[in-house]
Amino acid sequence: MAIDKTTLAILACPKCKGKLTYYADKDELVCRGERLAYPIDENIPVLIADKARELSSEELEKVPS
């Protein structure tokens, strides 16, 4: 599922309120500042910090800017 640009522009990381990037390869929303990836479940972003997974430096490098 792709997130449209308008929706992505209004979403923010619940932890730091920073910008999120859509990572199509994993179908996740990524916060670079917190190094967290939020899942998308049945086309709904799950923006709950406890549900996010931490990204390694290697994974973070693969996420498009």
Swiss-Prot record:
Belongs to the UPF0434 family. This is UPF0434 protein IL1511. One of its GO terms (cellular component) is cytosol. Signal peptide: none annotated. It holds the Pfam family Trm112p. PANTHER family: PROTEIN PREY, MITOCHONDRIAL (PTHR33505:SF4), ZGC:162634 (PTHR33505). HAMAP family: UPF0434 (MF_01187).
